[in-house]
């Protein structure tokens, strides 16, 4: 996924990420990514990944991605349970967003470091700094105190070992 993102930036475009709750959605997303000749990220929510069926979905998405005509990453998105992250990687996730943003900066850093030690260097590790209230499906008004503090970014990335960073800049 790192190479996928770097190539997109160099080409002047983004790599879209779509949350896939089922295989049919993933098929449609990958088909359109192939039609556009663009890389894509298939996200799986922790709630979906937390069941045997969800882990099977991750495995199926990995196979779909391996046979796609464009680069496809499979990411466990916004996971705060280290053991779930490990199970998702074992099932085939190629990237994880280790979300320790509910804790202090130090707790978040320690959580991301723990996840890195559990999943190894081959899995792309994204972390979150700052938070938006609500969830992916329902957002609430945020305060500035919950947004990413730009003064913390460099230290957090260096100390945590995250390769990618999800920042909270507000809702549009």
What are these regions (language model features)?
Residues 1-11, 21-48, 55-71, 79-172:
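Alpha/beta enzyme core
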Residues 13-17:
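Boundary/entry segment of secreted carbohydrate-active catalytic domains
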């Amino acid at each position: 996924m790192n190479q996928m993102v770097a190539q997109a930036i160099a080409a002047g475009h983004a790599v879209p990420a779509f949350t896939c709750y089922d295989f049919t959605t993933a098929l449609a997303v990958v088909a359109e990514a192939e039609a556009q000749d663009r890389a894509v990220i298939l996200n799986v929510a922790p709630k979906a990944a937390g069941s045997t069926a969800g882990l099977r979905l991750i495995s199926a998405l990995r196979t779909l991605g391996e046979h796609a005509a464009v680069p496809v990453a499979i990411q466990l998105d916004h996971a705060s349970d280290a053991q779930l992250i490990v199970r998702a990687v074992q099932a085939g996730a190629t990237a994880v967003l280790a979300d320790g943003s509910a804790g202090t900066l130090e707790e978040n850093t320690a959580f991301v470091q723990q996840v890195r030690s559990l999943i190894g260097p081959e899995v792309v590790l994204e972390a979150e700094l700052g938070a938006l209230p609500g969830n992916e499906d329902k957002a609430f008004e945020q305060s500035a105190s919950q947004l990413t503090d730009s003064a913390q970014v460099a230290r957090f990335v260096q100390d945590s070992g995250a390769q990618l960073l999800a920042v909270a800049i507000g809702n549009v």
